[in-house]
């Protein structure tokens, strides 16, 4: 074997090893790359009990039930499917029915998602992209989804002296 053939063999072998390593890394990260799975995706993937993942969607209105010792159950929906969630702990301040949520945990044998972490949305206009796309595709999308509700104006009355004093301080 000449020097040139040996060099090409070594370079080809190194490229092959790098390609195999990249393939193994991408295969291992395949499920981790997705930030969360929607209930429809969970049903399609047939995720088995005990496998940890993130579940995202909207808290189904009327599904929130509080139990003893901070135990809470609710359903997460994406417009196509619903998944029951059980959580024991303090819920975030922004958590409420009809709002976006991401929970981390695993399914149990009964098909209930046992969450050990629950995150509520931060932005008033937030809706997971997959949920919005699913709602649009199924024809359930409403233009007011994801928009903040305006607060009801209360009675405001200022006397003339207070108006000028308030205007002077601004």
UniProtKB/Swiss-Prot annotation:
Function: Heme chaperone required for the biogenesis of c-type cytochromes. Transiently binds heme delivered by CcmC and transfers the heme to apo-cytochromes in a process facilitated by CcmF and CcmH.
Recorded coiled-coil stretches: none
Species lineage: Bacteria, Pseudomonadati, Pseudomonadota, Alphaproteobacteria, Hyphomicrobiales
Keywords (A to Z) from UniProt: Cell inner membrane, Cell membrane, Cytochrome c-type biogenesis, Heme, Iron, Membrane, Metal-binding, Signal-anchor, Transmembrane, Transmembrane helix
Cytoplasmic side: 1-7
Location of this chain's protein in the cell: Cell inner membrane
Transmembrane segments: 8-28
Chain residues that bind heme: 122, 126
Superkingdom of this protein's organism: Bacteria
Signal peptide residue numbers: none
Gene Ontology molecular-function annotations: heme binding; metal ion binding
Region feature Disordered, mapped onto this chain: 137-170
PANTHER family, sorted: CYTOCHROME C-TYPE BIOGENESIS PROTEIN CCME HOMOLOG, MITOCHONDRIAL
Example GO BP: cytochrome complex assembly
Predominant location category: membrane
UniProt-recorded name of the protein: Cytochrome c-type biogenesis protein CcmE
A Pfam family matched in the record: CcmE
């Amino acid at each position: 074997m000449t020097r040139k053939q040996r060099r090409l063999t070594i370079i080809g072998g190194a490229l092959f090893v790098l390609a195999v390593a990249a393939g193994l890394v991408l295969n291992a990260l395949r499920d981790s790359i997705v930030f969360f799975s929607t209930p429809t995706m969970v049903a399609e993937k047939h995720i088995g009990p005990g496998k940890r993942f993130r579940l995202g969607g909207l808290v189904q209105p009327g599904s929130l039930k509080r139990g003893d010792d901070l135990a809470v159950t609710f359903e997460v929906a994406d417009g196509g499917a619903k998944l029951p969630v059980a959580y024991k702990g303090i819920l975030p301040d922004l958590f409420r029915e009809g709002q976006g949520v991401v929970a981390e945990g695993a399914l149990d044998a009964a098909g209930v998602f046992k969450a050990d972490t629950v995150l509520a949305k931060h932005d008033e206009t937030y809706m997971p992209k997959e949920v919005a796309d699913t709602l649009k595709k199924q024809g359930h999308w409403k233009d007011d989804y994801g928009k903040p509700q305006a607060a009801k104006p209360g009675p405001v009355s200022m006397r003339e002296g207070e108006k000028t004093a308030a205007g002077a301080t601004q």
